Amino acid sequence: MSDRRPIATLPDLLISQIAAGEVIERPASVLKEILENAIDAGARAIEVRLEGGGIRRIAVTDDGSGIPPEELPLALTRHATSKIRSLDELESVASMGFRGEALASIASVADLTIISRTRGAEHAWQIDGGSLQVSPASGPPGTTIDVRQLFDRVPARRKFLRSEATEFGHCVDAMERIALAHPEVAFRLFHHDRAQRQWLPADHGQRIRDVLGAEFVGHVLPVQAAAGAIALMGMVTRPTAARARADRQYLYVNGRFVRDRTVSHALRSAYADVLHGDRQPAYVLYLDIDPGAVDVNVHPAKHEVRFRDSGAVHRFVSQVVGQTLAQTGGAEAVPAGVPDGAAPDAAYAGEPAAAAPGLAEPRAPYPAAYPSPGQSPYQGSPARPHTQVPFRLHGEPAGIPATDWQSLYRPLPGDAAPAATALRAAPATPLPTADEHPLGQALAQLHGIYILAQNSRGLVLVDMHAAHERVVYEQLKRALDDRALPRQDLLVPVVFHAAEKDVALVEEHETQLNELGFEMRPSGPASIAVRSVPALLARGDIESLARAVLRDLGAVGVSRLLTEQRNELLSTMACHGSVRANRRLTLEEMNALLRQMEITERADQCNHGRPTWVQWSVNDLDKLFLRGQ
């Protein structure tokens, strides 16, 4: 056994290097900390110059308030800051930085120089991070922080850096995240004295377009809602524009980029019915909440936050985004005022350039019931009548009682009358105009699978089974949502061993569990008894179901597991209760299905996230046949 070493105070330099290990991972970490300081200083224009991907040099110049010469040494002292003075200020902090560790940590692992000039000062002053000597310098009002030779003093850290190109890419990512959060600030980025990025001051919508591109904005839906002290705004992609990777997901809480599992879970819940396979949504969302209701001091790099009431945040985000995605079928087919020759992106997105600036407008109050947020980007489109004849096959009854939801998936009748699809004389189908139904009028059926329809833009092709599946699925969900969740009492309670924290969760969330159809009670210090469960799920594994619900409650303060399992059952029922392939439909039945799609939420995708229809404009068809070329 080795001799015991006495306890000793660590040198200040080593303390700063240890702190740097938590905060400074790579050049992008340095850039993030300096940019946040510039934002806190009130900068309206920031210039960044990099060399070697930020490994050899990071120089950030801003036009903020500057630092007086007598405070420059304090700026490089650990735990010295102008942001907070008390615990109360920490608990409601609104600035990006507040710990006073960043500059001291950077100076301990790199060569650092600060040149700063306050407004009204005769000249600038500079300080060297090594000697801490302050001397006169030249420079405009504002601050320049110059960092060179990152990790030269800590070779063990430097060997973990990647190539210069990779590190430069991370620096660009860090700058984009901050630029998206602060559209009022102008940014310029240079690498080896070559201009790489430039973003002028703009509103949120224009900044998103500038940073992420017109293609991204061309496939998004605007989000804007508020309820009490919480508000959400931004953009979410349509389900059809989901990505293979989760690489374009930007969440800001009070202007700070974070990764939060509560909001991530809420967004997955909102997209649950409309994403195909393992596709990932893209979004830029700004969540504003009372600073006292969120703790930002939970992660060394401030990448995570903790909400005081995570369940309320989850419900708000999930319902707002869910309502945004729940547009009726065909909303993208005929946007108002889009000429036939319009670019596909413009026609698809409903003029995103006009919708994006609306993100900067003041938020309207959002009722507690969370109706559809804001106005649709298609608000100029004529209202669609909601008095259509429901889609029915021959022999199907004319109506379904609202309480008889089981009849929605009754077995289909026998062969329906075949549609007249052969080439023969038939009445000419008038060309629909833009003020008629977005999905147009049915023309024929193809291979017993697809419906061909004509609208004012061109040709619409509908997968009739996928479309009818979504219609039936939404009817089933509405029928169950309108009634209390039935509960089934167990003859013999299911008792299982549980951790003490799970027993505490049962007591804490008793009301919420009852609303979900559960009756759970602690049956001892380390066991839980389940006495009743939702009737729809009574035949499942009760213990596994209860544990999964408690796991959700412990993680995000809310559980959508029962809703997801219920919807999975309804999806299967809808699939088996929908019109099958090779079933011949009449034109009247085809048109009835199109009309129901137009008044059904999420009808652009089936229950499994596959598209239910596609649109070809006349221009698209002309290109196939080389017309006009």
Curated annotation (Swiss-Prot):
Signal peptide: none annotated. GO terms for biological process: mismatch repair. The keyword DNA repair applies. It comes from the Bacteria. One of its GO terms (cellular component) is mismatch repair complex. SUPFAM superfamilies: ATPase domain of HSP90 chaperone/DNA topoisomerase II/histidine kinase, DNA mismatch repair protein MutL, Ribosomal protein S5 domain 2-like. HAMAP family: DNA_mis_repair (MF_00149). This is DNA mismatch repair protein MutL. It comes from Bordetella bronchiseptica (strain ATCC BAA-588 / NCTC 13252 / RB50). The lineage of its organism: Bacteria, Pseudomonadati, Pseudomonadota, Betaproteobacteria, Burkholderiales.
